[in-house]
Amino acid sequence: MKILSYTIKKGGKSMKIKSYDIKLKEYEQYLSSLPFICTEKIESEKTVFVMVDIINGFIRGGVLHDKEIENIITPVKAFLEYCKRKNIKSIAFSDCHSEDSCEFATFPPHCIKGSNECKIVGDLSKIGGFEIIEKNSVNGFHASGFRKFLENNMNKSCYIVCGDCTDICVLNFCLSLKTFFNEINKSAEILVPINMTETFHAEKHDRSFANISALSVMETNGIKLVGGIEINE
């Protein structure tokens, strides 16, 4: 792929900026300008709230945890409380692996079944009102618990998805769910509030780039992005 570059003046010095840097900045600005959706526009009887891996092992401790992900808990908590009041169906995926999980060929051992890492963070578990679905891969769509839930809730046409990590488990689930509905020719909306999703930062995994890239891929595939959810009652 050919990468163009532009020369700009900064502090009396010439600097070259690659075109993809400019495009990323433009998309980042676009994301920051996304409007919030009001709860008045959410049809309770048609909606499912999905929380992906908001668990101790990715937020509070463990080899793959990142404390920055903690920032999503406040808006997630507020909407979960709203869902409980309005009887909106809610589910929470929990990464839960056997000690010989095939996924450990890609990621270091984490969230072993029965450990504290698999538990939903206390801020949300205290609220309750949601079904916990264990998963053994980065894609909760394939979990038997979710396939059963989906089969029993085909009347739902709006899935609001949040959690971590934006570019791994959230991305995989959203794409699979969207393409499933497309395959059976069912009109359904997958909605992602970007202030309720986050990913980790590491030497070869830039948080900002990973978030922006994943959100762009989701939007390209028909998933609706919003800045967040404004709760009005």
Please tell me what each predicted stretch does:
Residues 92-114:
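A basic- and aromatic-enriched beta-loop-alpha substructure that forms the phosphate/nucleotide-
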Residues 45, 49, 62-96:
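A short alpha/beta connector and helix-capping loop motif
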Residues 61-62, 101-105, 143-145:
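Short, conserved acidic/polar surface loops in the N-terminal third of protein domains
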Residues 2-48, 109-233:
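Active-site-adjacent betaalpha module
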Residues 54, 95, 195:
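Active-site loop/turn elements of alpha/beta-hydrolase fold enzymes
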Residues 63-70, 107-112, 137:
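Short coil/turn segments at secondary-structure boundaries
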Residues 57, 97-99, 166:
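Solvent-exposed loop/turn segments at secondary-structure junctions
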Residues 54-62:
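Short acidic, Gly/Ser-rich segments with clustered Asp/Glu that frequently serve as metal-coordination loops
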